[in-house]
Amino acid sequence: MHNSSELIAVINGFRNSGRFCDINIVINDERINAHRLMLSGASEYFSILFSSDFIDSNDYEVNLSHLDYQSVNDLIDYIYGIPLSLTNDNVKYILSTADFLQIGSAITECEKYILKNLCSRNCIDFYIYADKYNNKKIESASFNTILRNILRLINDENFKYLTEESMIKILSDDMLNIKNEDFAPLILIKWLESTQQPCTVELLRCLRISLLSPQVIKSLYSHRLVSSIYECITFLNNIAFLDESFPRYHSIELISIGISNSHDKISINCYNRKKNTWEMISSRRYRCSFAVAVLDNIIYMMGGYDQSPYRSSKVIAYNTCTNSWIYDIPELKYPRSNCGGVADDEYIYCIGGIRDQDSSLISSIDRWKPSKPYWQTYAKMREPKCDMGVAMLNGLIYVIGGIVKGDTCTDALESLSEDGWMKHQRLPIKMSNMSTIVHAGKIYISGGYNNSSAVNGPSNLVLSYNPIYDEWTKLSSLNIPRINPALWSAHNKLYVGGGISNDQTTTSETYDKEKDCWTLDNGHVLPRNYIMYKCEPIKHKYPLEKIQYTNDFLKCLESFIDS
């Protein structure tokens, strides 16, 4: 006898011939011979049963008629060294039986099989099973598979077996794999129709209402399983008062704009979530110190330097929907660099900067509306400046800090509306060259230079401004001081990356609001020799947004699933 497997094979031969068997497992009219010692060694259930008062030592039978005979037989064969023959049809029965009998190795083998074979064809079935038997490992994996394949599953025959509680969980999840929030109501309606269950307010609350198109909101209003419920109509009548929703993880693309370390090109990179890497999707001739603004998923780059010693008045753009460059855009009124860029729903604004002729600071704010033939002067700042932070919030253009006359930083904060300029609470410290983002109704700034007099080294400061209370709050500092970093908001989180810190940095950081701390983010590491200049979350757009509302709009929406 050379090893344990040979010994087990011999004992199995004894079992098959009935030698030394001291227990019979009875399931209805079927009997399975076995040895107590073998069963006790593999099964916690049998170990307790045979070593306690549950069964008399002289009893020769154990009745397990409440279990599936074939599963028990397969598991006893497994105890005697015969491998489990698992299929999608039998694995659930074997797993639940192994769980009852507490055969740990068989449970692990079944779980591995299910996890390996999970797909869109069986994930709902396994999710319902795991929920019933409280198997958290399989439940989590199958739920994530449902999220990834949700738009395939809305026509699956098992879709109707999901409970309302499960649908609330699915529709609430940030990782729901839809590239436009309009698909979430489609998922809800398909489930309501398959179950013929009336809608509830709890289900409607799972939708990111503020992100829905008017056509889809009308479709919800008019659907019989929604419109027949008074509470649902009341909820929809009050959606104007709901807080702004954050887009789901898959409904935006992260697009970064940067320049190569070798100073030979502008690079447009897209974040690949599956690989956790940034991938270059396009590039063009080098330019730096330009302003960036995004309107209708088109990234505009204004002014700056190219490889000549002169500042540029040219404006170029990158269309993220068509992955193409746009060059036929009217030039700025005059060449400038180190300016700020923002956009509202109609216009792109180019703010301040440095003039080409005499390197003097600029106070003018020019704007351009796509399809118009030229830029117009919109307003002038109270003080000429460059390298300031700019943000658009609640219809106001905020100008934050910057470099003013004498090459010094300023702590001024002002906003521009149709009624003119308004002063606000000054920055806690004079700053310039910081990154700026609007997030959750506040303005956040990070990095740059900060100094009470002349401009000097990089900063790791992070501040937030609350426009309601007109106050600044100092947050936890960055791990790495950065000049002109990219600051972006995605999935209700803040990120900072790139910029210059003594040398160019490829690192990024994530902000934990609850702990008030920044952590280095290994998931958004930038390519080598790449200076991230700006990062913009781009919301996916679909041709359906141009389609007029009809009674069968949701059916029309369904046709865009694979687009």
Swiss-Prot record:
Residues 21-88 form the BTB domain. SUPFAM superfamilies: Kelch motif (SSF117281), POZ domain (SSF54695). One of its GO terms (biological process) is symbiont-mediated perturbation of host ubiquitin-like protein modification. Keywords: Host cytoplasm, Host-virus interaction, Kelch repeat, Modulation of host E3 ubiquitin ligases by virus, Modulation of host ubiquitin pathway by virus, Repeat, Ubl conjugation pathway. Pfam families: BACK, BTB, Kelch_1. GO terms for cellular component: host cell cytoplasm. Residues 123-219 form the BACK domain. Probable substrate-specific adapter of CUL3-containing E3 ubiquitin-protein ligases which mediate the ubiquitination and subsequent proteasomal degradation of host target proteins. This is Kelch repeat and BTB domain-containing protein 1. It comes from Cowpox virus (strain Brighton Red). The lineage of its organism: Viruses, Varidnaviria, Bamfordvirae, Nucleocytoviricota, Pokkesviricetes. The gene is KBTB1.
